[in-house]
Curated annotation (Swiss-Prot):
This is ATP phosphoribosyltransferase, chloroplastic. Feedback inhibited by histidine. It comes from Oryza sativa subsp. japonica. InterPro entries: ATP-PRT_HisG_long, ATP_PRibTrfase_cat, ATP_PRibTrfase_CS, ATP_PRibTrfase_HisG, HisG_C, N-reg_PII-like_a/b, N-reg_PII/ATP_PRibTrfase_C. It is an enzyme of class 2 (transferase). One of its GO terms (biological process) is L-histidine biosynthetic process. It comes from the Eukaryota. Its cofactor is Mg(2+). Belongs to the ATP phosphoribosyltransferase family. Long subfamily. Its main location: plastid. Its EC number is 2.4.2.17.
């Protein structure tokens, strides 16, 4: 808090303290109505007199985008999202060193000058927008809801392969919704009027309202909810819900169903950056590049297997022709084939060729069968940790978006 702003809590304390009556000339705070807070402003003279009563020394206002040398990344502070984030970073040789679990800060020894801050996901997005964080790992649903299309946010990697879910609209299975199976069916129901709008409960007010508006719903009211939204229709508090869905089991167990066209957003974990930081803060672009390369190399290697085998042949070209005739042995850019040297009668001879090819783990057995069918033997299987490309396409895309 800057010195100048230090007077504000004292004024607020005077206004909001239950035991204190408002100073002369000041109005008491207005009550908060459903869904909308109404704010009344203090008259200039009254505000000035209240501030003078507190007496504060004038001080310089700190810049909103304060200079600092350390780069900050925000990570989820708790829950499964936090565990999966730390696990992914560890797999990329970016282990987070968190010495005191009571503290909100940590570091990554492999990346000097990078400071880790554990935050609530929505606070990560807000602090990226303000410039208090430079990078963050957070679900795309949270980025979309709290970022609200802000140009201050740049999605660096949009598919970190965990935290998968969808923001979806669900309706009751019975009653007036029994035959409602599409979004169009729901919009065309005659029940919704200006006097009796469709009542939607959601924790995603921005995305929910935007979705309903873009899909032609004219008579809709929104109720903010947080947790156990599935109970609202059964209790008569709402007609439908817009909530995060993973497997859909919770919806089914509460007699709700998704409808065609009702998916608002597909989401998973993403790496997000503050645009201003990428442009202005020293070290942010370089650290972003390193993290992106590590993440991309590891995620590309996930699910891929290196298969090595020996095969008799008269030449590397002949062996290559046999290997490439098999659909599952094409590799990333093609198989690598090299001679296997043996000593025969005191001379070096080549009778076998070694084949190295990357195949999807899910088709491993099929690949081994195909290798055997063309003469492969001594098959070795190696799990891959990283596959570094010449340059990740996401990095080129980021530079293009930044105009660099």
């Amino acid at each position: 808090m800057s010195p100048m702003l230090a007077t504000l809590p004292d004024v607020t304390a005077v206004l909001h303290s239950p035991s204190a009556s408002p100073p002369s000339g000041l109005r008491a705070p207005a009550a908060v109505g459903m869904g909308m807070a109404r704010t009344r402003f203090l008259a200039p003279r009254a505000a000035a007199s209240a501030a003078s009563a507190v007496s504060a020394k004038p001080a310089a206002v700190a810049p909103l985008y304060a200079d600092r040398t350390v780069v900050r990344i925000g990570l989820p502070s708790k829950g499964r999202m936090s565990e999966q984030t730390l696990s992914l970073l560890k797999s990329c040789q970016l282990s987070v060193r968190h010495l005191n679990p009571r503290q909100y800060t940590a570091d990554i020894p492999q990346v000097p000058n990078l400071e880790v801050w554990f935050q609530r996901p929505k606070d990560i997005v807000r602090k990226l927008q303000s410039g208090d964080l430079d990078l963050g790992i957070v679900g795309f649903d949270i980025v979309s809801e709290y970022g609200q299309g802000s140009d201050d946010l740049v999605v660096v990697h949009d598919a970190l392969e965990f935290g998968h879910c969808r923001l979806s609209l669900a309706v009751p299975k019975e009653g007036i919704f029994e035959n409602i199976n599409t979004l169009e069916d729901l919009a065309n129901m005659p029940e919704w009027t200006q006097e009796r709008p469709l009542r939607v409960v959601t924790g995603f007010g921005y995305l929910g309202e935007k979705f309903m508006r873009e899909n032609g719903f004219n008579h809709v009211s929104f109720l903010a909810g947080d947790g156990a939204l599935e109970s609202y229709p059964a209790m008569g508090m709402a007609d439908v819900i817009v909530d995060l869905v993973s497997s859909g089991t919770t919806l089914r167990e509460n007699n709700l169903k998704e409808i065609d066209g009702g998916v608002v957003l597909e989401s998973q974990a993403t790496l997000v950056a503050c645009r201003r930081s990428l442009h202005k803060r020293n070290g942010v672009l370089e650290i972003t590049h390193e993290m992106l390369e590590r993440l991309e190399a590891h995620l590309t290697a996930t699910g891929e297997i290196m298969v090595t085998a020996n095969m008799r042949g008269n030449s590397a070209e002949e062996v290559a022709e046999r290997v490439l005739s098999q659909t599952s042995l094409c590799g990333l850019q093609g198989p690598t084939i090299s001679p296997v040297y043996r000593s025969r009668d005191g001379k070096v001879a080549v009778e076998y060729y070694a084949i190295n090819v990357v195949v999807p783990q899910k088709s491993l057995y099929k690949s081994i069968q195909q290798l055997r069918s063309i003469g492969g033997s001594g098959v070795l299987v190696t799990k891959l940790t990283y596959i570094f490309d010449e340059e990740t396409p996401r990095w080129r895309k980021l530079l293009s978006e930044l105009g660099l």
